[in-house]
Structures are given as structure tokens and as C-alpha cells.
């Protein structure tokens, strides 16, 4: 009957109208997404994410819903990370003795939190605004300049068996130390490490030792700086045959001064270089 036909036709028209409305809505949504600009502030540089890149991530499914390619967003974040992350990347250090060394190991440095940054981009796209911000970091460093470590760090020179503690560019203290016993295969590894935590009155234990210390400052697993009052001499060649299990053994007064100055996250730059003494 004609009635059935007209009813079917009106369903089709209704469907078309709904689709048109949905289509217009999804076009609006896409325009809003493409109008988003995120300017990343890296201090020494800025990176801009805008519609040109964003449009590559957008598509519409069969039900006319906007789909964002999260893999595409993630690969953008990975590009940012490979450009601006500095953890595990080589660092040049002009040593306190004047020479320049490369420290090529260690977790210290900027590190973008990829999954959280993807989530933040998706939120920014939904909001459709122009924003300027830092990326979401899993880990931060002192500086975005040429050297990410800035001017606050402990410089631990394994060759000279001497360390320097700098805070805001000022030398707070320096001291001889004894590091890991080279002859027994306990040489202290070089690298850029953060202080994991610090604690008073710890007992350090290993398979064949138990050492009570007053100031314990680990930075690389169970390797750290601490006082060792049973040692009467520090520096020189002691470490080669009578060194520690890997830790940086310090005179009590130096350990105390360092402990009072540094906190969790403070940087230790450990390197091997020619032991030319200052002066």
C-alpha cells in the first residue's frame, strides 16, 4: 500500500536528516581538533603541534564518529622524546681540573612520559584550544641548556679519587675518597646518576660484610656515598687493591657536609679522567 511506501520513505528521509546532522557535528568536531595548537616549551627551543600534523590522525567511522589515531599521536610523542630526552645520552663535563670528559652512561636527564603525554594531547584536542606548556615528564633535569645537569652536582673523579660538590655553581666542599676495588672486580661504574634517597645510621650488608654507617646516600642500585670511619686514609691508589665493594667511601666530615647539602634526585657525575691536580 502507498501508506507503507510513504512510511518507509519518511524513515529514509529521517535517517538522512540524522546523518546530515551527525555529519555536520563531526565536521565541526574535526575543525575544532584541527584548530588546536600545542606549543611545547623546552626553554631553549619551542616545538609546535598544529592542524597540519593533527589532521593526519583524524578519520570518521561508518557511524560518523570521529576517530583519533592514537598510534599516530604516540609516534609524534616518540619523536619529541628522541629529540629532547637526555637520559642515557652522553654528557660533556668540563672537570674541576680543567679537562673535558664525556659521561656516556646513566639514567639522569629529561624523560618524557609517553603514555601520559598522549593522554594530555587527546585532552587538549578535545578542548580545541591553543595551549603552551611543557610535555608531561617522567623525569626532569636541572637545565634545558647545552648540559642538562646545570650547575648543581657531585663531580666524582675516579682517576683522581677526589670529588667536588657544587650547588648553584658554588663549590660547597671537596674531598678525597676511596671507590670500588679494581683488583677484585668491584670498580665503581661511571655515569650520571640521581640520589635515590638518603638516610642516617644505615647498616650496609653484603655476602661477606656488614658495615654500619652514619650517612648513607645511594645513587646507583646499592652503590652510594657514605662515611667509613674504619678507613684512616683516602685518595691516591688505595682503590686499586684495597677499595670498597663499589661504594664511594668518604671521611666522616665530608660525608656529613654532602648529606646536609644534597637531597633525593641530586645528581652524581662519575667519570674517569687524568688526575691533574688543581693549582
Can you name each region flagged by the protein language model?
Residues 148-235:
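Gly/Pro-biased beta-strand-loop elements
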Residues 7-40, 115-147:
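Soluble, acidic/polar mature domains that operate outside membranes
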Residues 71-79, 115, 119, 123, ...:
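Solvent-exposed, polar/charged alpha-helical surfaces in well-ordered, non-transmembrane soluble domains
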Residues 75, 82-86, 90-103, 110-111:
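Extended, domain-scale alpha-helical bundle/helix-rich regions
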Residues 58-67, 103-112, 149-152, 214, ...:
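Second-shell loop/turn segments in exported
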Residues 2-9, 13, 270-279:
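Single conserved hydrophobic/aromatic residue that forms the stacking wall/gate
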Residues 105-185:
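Cell wall/extracellular polymer interaction/catalysis modules
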Residues 74-75, 187-188, 202-273, 277:
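Exported/periplasmic cell-wall-interacting domains
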